[in-house]
Curated annotation (Swiss-Prot):
It comes from Leuconostoc mesenteroides subsp. mesenteroides (strain ATCC 8293 / DSM 20343 / BCRC 11652 / CCM 1803 / JCM 6124 / NCDO 523 / NBRC 100496 / NCIMB 8023 / NCTC 12954 / NRRL B-1118 / 37Y). The keyword DNA repair does not apply. One of its GO terms (biological process) is translation. The keyword Acyltransferase does not apply. It holds the Pfam family Ribosomal_L17. This is Large ribosomal subunit protein bL17. The lineage of its organism: Bacteria, Bacillati, Bacillota, Bacilli, Lactobacillales. GO terms for molecular function: structural constituent of ribosome.
Length: 127
């Protein structure tokens, strides 16, 4: 299995990929290094594919990877609805890509980081 180590142990790497994937699903775009973005793109595409399947097993598989973070707070008078990242994946993000077979993200190169000249990129969901 080919993957990037990203200078971390396996548990640190998995935690970082979970965090970045969840942030991308919540916000729609993140700024990170090119190597990280290429790895996050793989995990994000897998999560969106699970969201498109939409069955209970797919929801459980996605729940093991996506962080349990608040994605949105909707206030309607006295009602306050809190939407988690998992709910946003299945209710908002996955239906946007119902007609698309993969390629849910795009990587746009930006400037190099000042401290170590690492190539920074913007990773965003395709509209």
């Amino acid at each position: 299995m080919a993957y990037r180590k990203l200078g971390r142990t396996s548990s640190q790497r998995k935690a970082m990929l979970r965090d970045l994937t969840t942030d991308l699903l919540i916000n729609g775009r993140i700024t990170t290094t090119e190597a990280r973005a290429k790895e996050v793109r793989k995990t994000t595409d897998k999560m969106i594919t699970l969201g498109k399947r939409g069955d209970l097993n797919a929801r459980r598989q996605a729940a093991t990877f996506v962080r349990n973070e608040v994605a949105d707070v909707i206030e309607d008078g006295d009602d306050v609805k809190v939407q988690s990242a998992l709910q946003k994946l299945f209710d908002d993000v996955a239906p946007r890509f119902a007609e698309r077979n993969g390629g849910y993200t795009r990587i746009l190169k930006t400037v190099q980081r000042r401290g170590d000249a690492a190539q920074l990129v913007i990773l965003e969901l395709v509209d």
